[in-house]
Amino acid sequence: MKILVGFTTTPEGQAALRHAVAEAKQHAAGLVIAHYEQVTPPVGDVPERYRGAEQRLDALRDELDAEGIDVTTRSEIGVATVSSKLLQVAEDEAVDLIVIGLRRRTPVGKLVLGSTAQEVLLGAGCPVLAVKRDQTA
């Protein structure tokens, strides 16, 4: 079994990561941690938050390797949407489960802005576990 989690440093992203790690431990599954930074053209300097996320991914991979979890990290920057990149990684890695974090939004916010989570839920070819930020693994 292989599990994919979208990595962000937000409370929602951290909740998703906790759940993905718990699922990986429970099922002796491989874990793919993907981080994608969407930028608008022209793409100049790599945003500082992207470099910070890459450093955190490296530390996370080492930490989880030490716990006996088979971890792969994927990090990229580009103009595609986060949801499309997450779905592409899911397909490339042939994952069995995607874990994503959810944030609370107003009904109007959901209609006007769209939703990365909704796009992943509807576009995934495997089950998706959606985690709220206040849930613990």
Regions flagged by a language model, labelled:
Residues T116, A124-G125:
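Short, structured coil segments at secondary-structure junctions
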Residues M1-P47, D65-I69:
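Small/aliphatic-rich secondary-structure junction motif
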Residues A66-I98, T136-A137:
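Structural beta-alpha unit
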Residues I100-E119, A137:
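Glycine-rich, Arg-bearing micro-motifs that act as flexible, cationic patches
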Residues C126-A137:
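Short, flexible loop segments at boundaries between secondary-structure elements
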Residues H35-Y36, L97, G101-R103, K132-R133:
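Short secondary-structure boundary segments
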